[in-house]
A protein has these predicted regions:
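Residues that scaffold, gate, or flank divalent-cation-dependent active/transport sites
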Residues: 1-131
Length: 131
């Protein structure tokens, strides 16, 4: 599984990881693009590392918004989070999300940083690290 630093600037660093389960304490403060779905199990893992921003795949959203449930969990802790549309990036493929992802959902903390639904993920995150 891929885990790589793909961008770095005065505002931080962007790490892509195919699974959020690859996160470690060394990733604290990073902007993380994960290939994982944005469900509650992914949210629980993401809460264990203090990310600046974390992005998941919306996995088609699913019943009762299960594919994006992590966004509310993370918002409750003040963590900026979003999802890319499953139609824009393959689930489980963080590099594809970084290169082709379109934001489908953003929590309030992410919107406060300037992330918006419909934005090209790479451009939006690049603006955060190199304002």
């Amino acid at each position: 599984m891929l885990k790589a630093l793909v961008a770095k600037g005065p505002g931080g660093r962007v790490i892509v990881m195919d699974s959020i389960s690859q996160a470690t304490p060394k990733d604290a403060g990073a902007i993380v693009v994960s290939g994982s779905h944005g469900g509650t199990s992914s949210g629980e893992i993401a809460l264990g590392v203090p990310f600046k921003v974390v992005v998941f795949n919306d996995a088609g959203v699913g019943k009762d918004d299960a594919g994006v449930a992590a966004l509310e969990m993370l918002q409750a802790r003040g963590v900026a989070a979003g999802t890319v549309a499953h139609t824009s990036a393959r689930i489980g493929d963080a590099r594809d999300a970084w290169e082709n992802g379109i934001l489908s959902r953003c929590n309030a903390a992410a919107r406060n940083l300037g992330l918006e639904t419909g934005a090209i993920l790479r451009e939006a995150l690049s603006a955060l690290i190199d304002p």
